[in-house]
């Protein structure tokens, strides 16, 4: 029997989430999964969006932020290692794109991500992860939209 769960004010049915994978779960792939599953995907999530590269986060140029209306409910996953940049990006994404949630990635084990202190690399620096979550949550709470924050993480580093 398919079950549901609640994410703040959103009833998600069924209780399935298409796991975001960089280079795989782009908008056409997510749309295909939604259609071929017969709408048995409760949530779809973007590929992770980098936040560290720009001096000021810009929505343009991030193909990961493209999504189709039928992908809703839809979340945007962000990654980085700088709390202020992640918070600014989350607020800009929330206020301009209105996803159902923002997700912080603390789970990617790829050396090019974790090795630079992002993704699962944050699990080696829990005070930084705590600061990121605090700052992103504060930014979302101060935004003009009501969007929850979620976290993708691993059980541990080792």
Feature locations, PLM:
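Glycine-rich, proline-tolerant flexible connector loops at the mouths of alpha/beta enzymes
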Residues: 50-55, 106-126
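Alpha-helix-loop-beta-strand connector modules within alpha/beta enzyme cores
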Residues: 65-73, 122-150
């Amino acid at each position: 029997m398919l079950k549901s769960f609640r994410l703040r004010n959103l009833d998600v049915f069924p209780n399935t989430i298409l796991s975001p994978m960089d280079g795989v779960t782009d908008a056409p792939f997510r749309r295909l999964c939604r259609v071929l599953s017969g709408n048995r995907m409760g949530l779809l999530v973007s590929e992770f969006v980098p936040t560290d590269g720009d001096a000021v986060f810009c929505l343009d140029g991030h193909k990961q932020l493209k999504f189709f209306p039928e992908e809703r409910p839809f979340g945007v996953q962000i990654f980085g290692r700088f709390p202020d940049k992640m918070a600014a990006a989350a607020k800009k994404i929330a206020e301009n794109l209105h996803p159902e949630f923002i997700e912080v990635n603390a789970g990617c084990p790829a050396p090019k991500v974790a090795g630079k202190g992002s993704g699962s690399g944050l699990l080696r620096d829990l005070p930084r992860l705590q600061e990121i979550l605090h700052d992103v949550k504060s930014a979302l709470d101060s935004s003009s939209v009501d969007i929850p924050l979620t976290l993708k993480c691993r059980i541990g580093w080792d």
